[in-house]
Amino acid sequence: MELTPRDKDKLMLFTAGLLAERRKAKGLKLNYPEAIALITCAIMEGAREGRTVAEMMALGREMLTRDDVMEGIAEMIQDVQVEATFPDGTKLVTVHNPIV
């Protein structure tokens, strides 16, 4: 099976997102890469399911709170940008201040 570099990146993000999801479910506080991966993975999957850009932006802001991440992580993540594939094409989704 041949994967393009973009497909490899998507697969790596998905794997990191699953790991972050499991750690969050265990009650562990997420670090920077885990928080980014969780938000990114959810946006990519939602886009693939046919949701709108606005829905994905809202989802990105609702996924994590300060209690879900390690100290200082919320301040480190000001924006998350994801290039996601929607039914009508690839679009850039930007989530400002995703951790409340």
From Swiss-Prot:
<comment type="subunit">
    <text>Heterotrimer of UreA (gamma), UreB (beta) and UreC (alpha) subunits. Three heterotrimers associate to form the active enzyme.</text>
</comment>
<dbReference type="InterPro" id="IPR050069">
    <property type="entry name" value="Urease_subunit"/>
</dbReference>
<comment type="similarity">
    <text>Belongs to the urease gamma subunit family.</text>
</comment>
<dbReference type="InterPro" id="IPR012010">
    <property type="entry name" value="Urease_gamma"/>
</dbReference>
<dbReference type="InterPro" id="IPR002026">
    <property type="entry name" value="Urease_gamma/gamma-beta_su"/>
</dbReference>
<keyword id="KW-0378">Hydrolase</keyword>
<comment type="pathway">
    <text>Nitrogen metabolism; urea degradation; CO(2) and NH(3) from urea (urease route): step 1/1.</text>
</comment>
<dbReference type="Pfam" id="PF00547">
    <property type="entry name" value="Urease_gamma"/>
</dbReference>
<dbReference type="GO" id="GO:0016151">
    <property type="term" value="F:nickel cation binding"/>
</dbReference>
<dbReference type="GO" id="GO:0043419">
    <property type="term" value="P:urea catabolic process"/>
</dbReference>
<dbReference type="InterPro" id="IPR036463">
    <property type="entry name" value="Urease_gamma_sf"/>
</dbReference>
<dbReference type="GO" id="GO:0005737">
    <property type="term" value="C:cytoplasm"/>
</dbReference>
<dbReference type="GO" id="GO:0009039">
    <property type="term" value="F:urease activity"/>
</dbReference>
<keyword id="KW-0963">Cytoplasm</keyword>
<protein>
    <recommendedName>
        <fullName>Urease subunit gamma</fullName>
        <ecNumber>3.5.1.5</ecNumber>
    </recommendedName>
</protein>
